[in-house]
């Protein structure tokens, strides 16, 4: 059954969310999502769309509705292949890809490195999010990981990325400062992203 967009919005933890359907299998109008997003854009500082990694109607609809894109990948060849196709499609459609987010890092020695991924996709990595068993628990309790385990490495990296998009300063530990870990490649990329973000999205 169809409902009004406003009626589908659910609010919790200071965020408005429109949940997706698990069983929706009807043909999509690629431009309809863009029209819907445009109708609510002015109410929010940011509207974030989470799409399927597969190149289907949902992904294309999301790409066309977005002003700026981030490609999420895991550090393995099968997923990277899908991410490469998604990045190429976005560029073909004239949508800028601001960065790569590497998710679920488990064993760095046996996974693709940041350098490998950047070289393959030609896009800077802006976040390296470690795998965390607490993410499963947070999902089960329906509490965001950044609230469920605020001090976990996963939560800290997500907050660091958020800081670059909201023009805030990242929080660094004393150990990171003492041992020069503040100059990680992904952090440098986030600083560059912060400088360019408002020029590309919020330009006059």
Residue ranges and their predicted role:
Residues 92-204:
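C-terminal lobe/tail of nucleotide-utilizing enzymes
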Residues 23, 57, 145:
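Short, flexible micro-motifs
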Residues 11, 43-46, 158-164:
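Broad hydrophobic/π-residue packing in well-ordered secondary structure
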Residues 29, 33, 79, 154:
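Short, conserved glycine- and acidic-residue-centered signature motifs
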Residues 35, 39-42, 46, 51-131, ...:
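Conserved catalytic-core segment of NTP-binding enzymes
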Residues 1-42, 139-141:
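P-loop/Walker-type NTP enzyme "switch/lid" segment
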